[in-house]
Amino acid sequence: MAAAAVVVPAEWIKNWEKSGRGEFLHLCRILSENKSHDSSTYRDFQQALYELSYHVIKGNLKHEQASNVLSDISEFREDMPSILADVFCILDIETNCLEEKSKRDYFTQLVLACLYLVSDTVLKERLDPETLESLGLIKQSQQFNQKSVKIKTKLFYKQQKFNLLREENEGYAKLIAELGQDLSGSITSDLILENIKSLIGCFNLDPNRVLDVILEVFECRPEHDDFFISLLESYMSMCEPQTLCHILGFKFKFYQEPNGETPSSLYRVAAVLLQFNLIDLDDLYVHLLPADNCIMDEHKREIAEAKQIVRKLTMVVLSSEKMDEREKEKEKEEEKVEKPPDNQKLGLLEALLKIGDWQHAQNIMDQMPPYYAASHKLIALAICKLIHITIEPLYRRVGVPKGAKGSPVNALQNKRAPKQAESFEDLRRDVFNMFCYLGPHLSHDPILFAKVVRIGKSFMKEFQSDGSKQEDKEKTEVILSCLLSITDQVLLPSLSLMDCNACMSEELWGMFKTFPYQHRYRLYGQWKNETYNSHPLLVKVKAQTIDRAKYIMKRLTKENVKPSGRQIGKLSHSNPTILFDYILSQIQKYDNLITPVVDSLKYLTSLNYDVLAYCIIEALANPEKERMKHDDTTISSWLQSLASFCGAVFRKYPIDLAGLLQYVANQLKAGKSFDLLILKEVVQKMAGIEITEEMTMEQLEAMTGGEQLKAEGGYFGQIRNTKKSSQRLKDALLDHDLALPLCLLMAQQRNGVIFQEGGEKHLKLVGKLYDQCHDTLVQFGGFLASNLSTEDYIKRVPSIDVLCNEFHTPHDAAFFLSRPMYAHHISSKYDELKKSEKGSKQQHKVHKYITSCEMVMAPVHEAVVSLHVSKVWDDISPQFYATFWSLTMYDLAVPHTSYEREVNKLKVQMKAIDDNQEMPPNKKKKEKERCTALQDKLLEEEKKQMEHVQRVLQRLKLEKDNWLLAKSTKNETITKFLQLCIFPRCIFSAIDAVYCARFVELVHQQKTPNFSTLLCYDRVFSDIIYTVASCTENEASRYGRFLCCMLETVTRWHSDRATYEKECGNYPGFLTILRATGFDGGNKADQLDYENFRHVVHKWHYKLTKASVHCLETGEYTHIRNILIVLTKILPWYPKVLNLGQALERRVHKICQEEKEKRPDLYALAMGYSGQLKSRKSYMIPENEFHHKDPPPRNAVASVQNGPGGGPSSSSIGSASKSDESSTEETDKSRERSQCGVKAVNKASSTTPKGNSSNGNSGSNSNKAVKENDKEKGKEKEKEKKEKTPATTPEARVLGKDGKEKPKEERPNKDEKARETKERTPKSDKEKEKFKKEEKAKDEKFKTTVPNAESKSTQEREREKEPSRERDIAKEMKSKENVKGGEKTPVSGSLKSPVPRSDIPEPEREQKRRKIDTHPSPSHSSTVKDSLIELKESSAKLYINHTPPPLSKSKEREMDKKDLDKSRERSREREKKDEKDRKERKRDHSNNDREVPPDLTKRRKEENGTMGVSKHKSESPCESPYPNEKDKEKNKSKSSGKEKGSDSFKSEKMDKISSGGKKESRHDKEKIEKKEKRDSSGGKEEKKHHKSSDKHR
């Protein structure tokens, strides 16, 4: 009773008399306002009466009070007695169940009190007989029950008896005659009905049987629908409504026998009766078979069978078994066709559809599984017929093609049929709905298919052109969504079930091409991935398509492309998605299928090509496929195959590219660059723009010409017939605004690759992705530049500052995109000016061109200022920067040889055409005309380019004075030029690499003020390690091309004095005194002469060798790969020097051996380079032929420029450093180890060690010394004339016999001194005597060779300087090691000479040694500092490492082995003693320095100086790059501890470090000392120079 309290609260009952009664009456009045029985107020009213009565039963209220209030309420509602009787009925049941007798009594009292409100009849209907008896309404309940049963039996079960034998036959005969009469006259249904009534009454006919006869006659006379319908309506008004339905049901039941067939006339009668609502569908439906659950089971069985077929088709079965199974399947299907089950529900449905009763037909189909009804052909055709009728007026108006008559469809006469569609809006009413029920079974009616598609096409035209109101737009959008749904659910599935109908496919494309690609691809996606699973028939079709596709693909080859192509075309018309999905899966596995597949696709329809584009994108976007191979260093082959297929298929066939391009753009947005491979292939194939690093120099040269030359000579394959395909690509890009976004995304992604994609990926793969991104950008940008019109290009590409600052495009890419725009602008302005003033003079034309350049480039000059900090513009002007980035190779030079080559090819071609007798005359004429036209085009293009280049050069001549501002040093200017211009652009593309080299040459040729060509070239060649190491594979290739072009220029100047004098002699770029004041004029003395230039070129070659060897020995994949690529590119011009070439050859050979198993790609590169290097060996020359090496005059101040140790600071040649450059030199000292530029330090090239000052500067020598040395200088010159001594250089001199380095002493001063003293420490009395004699002989030698020119005070000063300088060098060396951070630094100073000793016969060697002895150490024309270092080093070696005379190798080995054993024993025994001796010697040595005579002081000082220099040299930037040796030496010295000083350890170390070189030991030295004793002092000198002379060889 929780709910009762809500309606009648207990408070009302408690205060009934006061307020409760009034409240209750008020409530009932409100609830009685709504008289409806369905409303909630009616239920609340019932509840209120129930609660009131319940309170009486509980005893809370008296029955009199309740009856009084109920009598008042009875006025509110007429149905009060009925409601009250219902309440009493419920209470009667409830109180009967209760055990409490009091409540039952209260209930009886209440009913009795209310008898005047409810009639007896109503109570007798509602209450139990027992209750009625207790109320006194009936006498006995039992009698009452019996009477009730009798009455019901009489009413419902007793039948009226008729006399069937006598009267009835005549009555029925008369009835049939009445119904069968001619109804065309004035006879009406009412008149007939009166006659029927008379017959029933007269003959006592059964009304049900009469009704049955009427239905039978109706079946036979369907043309009189209206008459019979009105007759039945009138007749049924006298019968029970259900009677008609039961009779019809009985008729249907009669035909439900096993072989029974329901007549169509019965279906039609039932349908008409349903349409006019004479019967109810629900009532009739239960009489029809089969039952709904049987239909559902049948549907499930069909799906299971379809899946079973799929499984069988996908199983691998032998062909014979397969054929047997197929035959059995066919037999089963035939059996099924013979015995179709009779489905009465479908029969009725067909009849309904035929008469146009869509509503009832829809209700029946809703009871069945989706498309179950339509899967029966008759039903499908009936729906199609109804749709034909409904869309007829609209189709006649908008769908009939021009010139077509068509066959009009007659409308249904039935007024209740669906209304015909007059407009697109009317289609929403019924037509779209009908199509949804039809589904894929529209395939039964291709004509209706075509009609719908044509209506859809007309709607899309109207939709796209419509500029109507907002309301209309909303309506049309609803129709569009309905049309898309119909396409998805009906048109495409129906196409799948049609038997390869190409016409339907083309018709459908007529509508599809009006959709945007997003709609189309969504539809294809649904079709491919969902539609085929929605219906059993489609499941079978999919399996059969795949089976057939497999059959075709297995047999597809290049030879049978045509027949296979036809089969593919036939299969694709109906099921393209399934077919292409399978074909693409095969292409991804077998890339050799690409060409035959592409050729076989020529029989497709337009729709199929579009579906193919979608399938390609879906295959590319497959998330389950890995885009990298398992090694994580290369892109997967499936992706490469798909990319290749894309390029080929999009080029050959007219396929819409928008979707593919948008997909690539979306991938780039998401930071994924793998799919750029697709774009690269598409642009390459469609536009003919090839991007490859393997271009020959001829191709590269052709690429610097005009468009015609590029097409003819710039690519590997002849690019033909790309006009249409490139136009399609351009249109796709412009129509969807993808041109600039793709460029910007690629430019941004290029740098993003490293950070977004480079995290966990292999460095090799990151490099490949970077290259792919960059190459595609270059290729794509090239396509846009050559294919977009000027207006299109300018409209889309923003200004340079916007590109860089707003879009964050890297500067090189931004200028690359803007460059064509500047060229277009300038040419259009120039044309305007030419037209405005028609002056034919060349000067006028040039002036106009320069004016147009200024107009176009002025805003660019302003824009570029924002790209860099203001400090940059102190070194180079914005004008120079913009000029460099805006020009191309086309602007700088005309490739005459390339034009000539192509013209000659055409001439040869024409001659071949003339000679060909088999060619038909017409074709001959055509081909010759083509060749002639092409030739004329090329010649015209060459002429045009020549004029253009002349104009550009004139412009540059005028601009050059404002290019370099000279606000800071030339060194800074060159740094900025290289950093902001040359290096970013030289690795951008192969043509840009050539451009950079040619631009540097052009700036030099223009005699540009403040530009040091020498410094620029020196900075480029001096240290390439860091640049090479930071390149990707393709960048390394381009950098190699750049170096190659730079070397080509340098080699041209180097090879001929006249060329050098002509092109460099008086040019400011070759000034050797570099000032920051802008003064470039100068004395002839300031210019670098030809011989010194050759020395500088040798230095550059040496630097390249050093860097190459360093990279090769790092073991790093990138270093090795890149340097091999660079070396391969510069092979035409480097190496030219024999010993450098041999050193490289050995290192590369080592790489070949090491990498053969580990890294096959490096092995292949190394082998390739090694082979090419060997073939170039015959062109290499000895070093003395490469640069002339005169021995320097003694004690003269030598003018030498830029040795291998030079740094990047400004320098002078032949004079002292200028004061205004000294500050620059100081600031650049930190760069001296990492960078090699042009640096000149004036030093004295003294012939004696004594003549060298400790800091390497000639300034410390006194004037006296110079004068005294002049005398010897004269003698030297006389000797020079007599004996043309072969000159040596520091680089070559430090090359050993077999290219392995000799160890250089790199210990701290203490160790070196200890070793010196130790060597002088005798082991026996004999040794002591030998040692003293040797010392004496050396003193004599030094006295003869060194004039005592310097005062004692100078000597003392030098003695004080020397140890401190050594300490500084030691510190410097340590700090350098720390900076390198574990990088292995070389031990020896340079490479060894590869010339073996045995090549020169003994007497000749002796003779050469004597010649060399007469000139103590020849000077190299590189830096004086380097010369001094070399002199000191050689003198140190003379003292420390005495070389024994040539011995046989076997003897040497024996002696070494014995000596090694002895020395090891001695070293163990005297280990402690040595330590003590070392300390004593150190003390003695310091005392001796104070006490020894001047001669000995000179010698010792020389030794110390040499060692210091030796150490200093090993850490200079020009050291030989053998990284492992130093670390080995260091480790050994640590492990040995106190054995360092012993000769045995030294000899052991020598043994390991210099493989193939002569090993030295104490035993050897003793022999040398004995021999030296016998020889004269000249002889001693001869031996001392033995080692260095060998190195020259």
From Swiss-Prot:
Residues 1583-1593 have a biased composition (Basic residues). The modification Phosphothreonine is found at residues 1385, 1443. Expressed in the hippocampus and the cerebral cortex. It comes from the Eukaryota. GO terms for biological process: blastocyst development; cell morphogenesis; generation of neurons; mRNA export from nucleus; mRNA processing; negative regulation of neuron projection development; neuron development; poly(A)+ mRNA export from nucleus. Residues 1-163 are annotated as: Anchor domain. It is found in: Nucleus; Nucleus speckle; Cytoplasm. Residues 687-1174 are annotated as: Stern domain. Changing residue 1100 to C: In MRXSK; uncertain significance. The keyword Iron does not apply. Residues 1251-1263 have a biased composition (Low complexity). Residues 535-686 are annotated as: MIF4G domain. Residues 1416-1425 have a biased composition (Polar residues). Residues 164-534 are annotated as: Bow domain. The modification Phosphoserine is found at residues 1222, 1390, 1393, 1417, 1450, 1486, 1516. One of its GO terms (cellular component) is nucleoplasm. Component of the THO subcomplex, which is composed of THOC1, THOC2, THOC3, THOC5, THOC6 and THOC7. The THO subcomplex interacts with DDX39B to form the THO-DDX39B complex which multimerizes into a 28-subunit tetrameric assembly. Component of the transcription/export (TREX) complex at least composed of ALYREF/THOC4, DDX39B, SARNP/CIP29, CHTOP and the THO subcomplex; in the complex interacts with THOC1, THOC3, THOC5, THOC7 and DDX39B. TREX seems to have a dynamic structure involving ATP-dependent remodeling. Interacts with POLDIP3 and ZC3H11A. Belongs to the THOC2 family. Component of the THO subcomplex of the TREX complex which is thought to couple mRNA transcription, processing and nuclear export, and which specifically associates with spliced mRNA and not with unspliced pre-mRNA. Required for efficient export of polyadenylated RNA and spliced mRNA. The THOC1-THOC2-THOC3 core complex alone is sufficient to bind export factor NXF1-NXT1 and promote ATPase activity of DDX39B; in the complex THOC2 is the only component that directly interacts with DDX39B. (Microbial infection) The TREX complex is essential for the export of Kaposi's sarcoma-associated herpesvirus (KSHV) intronless mRNAs and infectious virus production. This is THO complex subunit 2.
